[in-house]
Amino acid sequence: MMLVRSVFRSQLRPSVSGGLQSASCYSSLSAASAEAERTIREGPRNDWSRDEIKSVYDSPLLDLLFHGAQVHRHVHNFREVQQCTLLSIKTGGCSEDCSYCPQSSRYSTGVKAQRLMSKDAVIDAAKKAKEAGSTRFCMGAAWRDTIGRKTNFSQILEYIKEIRGMGMEVCCTLGMIEKQQALELKKAGLTAYNHNLDTSREYYPNVITTRSYDDRLETLSHVRDAGINVCSGGIIGLGEAEEDRIGLLHTLATLPSHPESVPINALLAVKGTPLEDQKPVEIWEMIRMIGTARIVMPKAMVRLSAGRVRFSMSEQALCFLAGANSIFTGEKLLTTPNNDFDADQLMFKTLGLIPKPPSFSEDDSESENCEKVASASH
């Protein structure tokens, strides 16, 4: 009798009205459930409709979190979280008008324009990051593009070679790049190139006017064609609607190949920028973005990025459960505050997380082939 009762109870779930529903009826209420099951069964796909992604995004939050976790555990080691460090190697003085950015020369934010950091300073920072547990070192320069920056670009190529030689993944975000520059970055050993789309195509002109959405997509195409991993995500909290968040995810999920890395940033409003009065992003908004990204781009590294400093350890744990498997660690993310190494080590210990080792998918023959292409195109 006890066994019968147990089985009977396991097949029934409470409904919103207080009655009982069968488990199959309950699960059919959620698009997250259906799409997660399909993703697990069929693997990644690039033909998502905007309505499909909206249905996943709009699923009940706890259901979305649960099914994001299902997909995450199916594709990844759910305890592994990669630690990355992002260093601003050329700070301030940017000519663009990105309304969230304290490095724009158009705003009075207290950020002073600086020259490119020396090789010794950059390598020292990379060594400290590695000692603290980071396996990916990212270098950011406050530039619109790399045109006319031949000397600085050549220096950065040397930085990449040396840091890659330390056994770390290397990522750069240097603004827009051309095909030839992408090939040279590949030849130097660059693992990934970051170029965020920031928001939906529709909302984008409200955030930036000095670089078009298609400019960003063109850079991603150059990166992909060069054989470099694509790192591209966005920022929430810019004043956009939920439809714009869905639009961002739809654009990323329908690229010819999904980005290997999808950073989800929560705006940290900086005084002096046009968005200084934006209200802080709530953790539930982050969870919804992360869970949806995990279901529609199952193999991507979903990176819990800027704004993490505002979330408690408990809140971050929910993000990892929903599908995030990477963080940026260190005192600063470019010029904004971030969680320091010690705090993150404590979090890893408390949550039972395991540092993800570096991953080098490119073999030597690929690098050699790319080197030949780069040489031939000079």
Curated annotation (Swiss-Prot):
Q: Which Pfam families match?
A: BATS (PF06968), Radical_SAM (PF04055)
Q: Is 4Fe-4S included in the keywords of this UniProt record? A: yes
Give GO terms: molecular function aspect only. 2 iron, 2 sulfur cluster binding; 4 iron, 4 sulfur cluster binding; biotin synthase activity; zinc ion binding
Cofactor binding, note field: Binds 1 [4Fe-4S] cluster. The cluster is coordinated with 3 cysteines and an exchangeable S-adenosyl-L-methionine. Binds 1 [2Fe-2S] cluster. The cluster is coordinated with 3 cysteines and 1 arginine.
Q: EC number(s) for this protein?
A: 2.8.1.6
Q: Which family does it belong to?
A: Belongs to the radical SAM superfamily. Biotin synthase family.
Q: What is this protein called?
A: Biotin synthase, mitochondrial
Q: Which organism is it from?
A: Arabidopsis thaliana (Mouse-ear cress)
